[in-house]
Amino acid sequence: MKLPIYLDYSATTPVDPRVAEKMMQFLTMDGTFGNPASRSHRFGWQAEEAVDIARNQIAELVGADPREIVFTSGATESDNLAIKGAANFYQKKGKHIITSKTEHKAVLDTCRQLEREGFEVTYLAPQRNGIIDLKELEAAMRDDTILVSIMHVNNEIGVVQDIATIGEMCRARGIIYHVDATQSVGKLPIDLSQLKVDLMSFSGHKIYGPKGIGALYVRRKPRIRIEAQMHGGGHERGMRSGTLPVHQIVGMGEAYRIAKEEMESEMARLRGLRDRLWNGVKDMEEVYLNGDLEQGAPNILNVSFNYVEGESLIMALKDLAVSSGSACTSASLEPSYVLRALGMTDELAHSSIRFSLGRFTTEEEIDYTINLVRNSIGRLRDLSPLWEMFKQGVDLNSIEWSHH
């Protein structure tokens, strides 16, 4: 077993060696390096064929038509293209959008930008376990609501929203439904031929493909229109201009092909490891699970260790690559906005750690992690005056702390 142990698969994954090997064939003079938009020679045709194969591989994993897959630079761009693209195209119909407070920043900040442009956005607060109350969603829907954006799996706490029911609710009212599926694709079954989802964002690097490539699913029947955000040569049926990066697209396609083959057995394995990790720490005092194991992704475990400062905990766990929040926001010392939206105190939010497991995680690593966490928490609490006061029965909420 090698240290440090990587348990931050929700931030990014290593490229699968099978994917890397495939990508190498599309870079050099000896390989298929052509521009797929070059229609006048073999180099272009071969590149175009490789892109078509990858488009099919992605469509097959999610039950879509390959013509519904639009390549982008990643899920952040897909979220932007979906939300801004739909809002701009349908704004004559209405200017109201619904999302949730626990979405990824790529959705929240896109909605904030649209608010500056005159759109109105309702941000739903989830229930304590992170699940959106569908009655609240229904109550928020209005005649001028044009778009709902609610993710499939939350990147911090792993809870799974009921996108099938939300899709039915939106379709019944003629509202477009966008789903950020970055954390669920290849981990949970997705069948867009059955789901009433109109737009869905995907990433390559969360599923053992390369960084810098993603896709947006845009439904054809009923046809969804979006306004391009990137203008140029009219690539991707006019929705996203820019020369297609064939090596990255091929990598994403291969990663999705592997995921389709291995998803069922791999997710059962990861669920077992996640449960083993939780069972190994849950009997400690003042340890709380964030999210919901029953309605959760099999590979994410978010736990708060009360009376331990999150930053010092991460320092103590230097042999583990884990995070306190998502990589995009963990650089700031602010507690996770996702956990705060669940109604958690700043103290508890600060002491939370996200463990995300993946393809190369072993049972040995999980057992090492359990021991390390138990020892580190014990040591840090021994040093903590707050823990001492808590053990003496002092109600810490009743203390007036002096500001200095």
UniProtKB/Swiss-Prot annotation:
Modified residues (N6-(pyridoxal phosphate)lysine): 206
Gene responsible for this protein: iscS
GO biological process: [2Fe-2S] cluster assembly
EC number: 2.8.1.7
Binding site for [2Fe-2S] cluster: 328
Subunit structure: Homodimer. Forms a heterotetramer with IscU, interacts with other sulfur acceptors.
SUPFAM superfamilies (alphabetical): PLP-dependent transferases
Organism: Klebsiella pneumoniae (strain 342)
Entry keywords, A to Z: 2Fe-2S, Cytoplasm, Iron, Iron-sulfur, Metal-binding, Pyridoxal phosphate, Transferase
Catalysed reaction equations from the record: (sulfur carrier)-H + L-cysteine = (sulfur carrier)-SH + L-alanine
Family that this chain belongs to: Belongs to the class-V pyridoxal-phosphate-dependent aminotransferase family. NifS/IscS subfamily.
GO CC annotation, single: L-cysteine desulfurase complex
Cofactors that this protein relies on: pyridoxal 5'-phosphate
Protein name according to UniProt: Cysteine desulfurase IscS
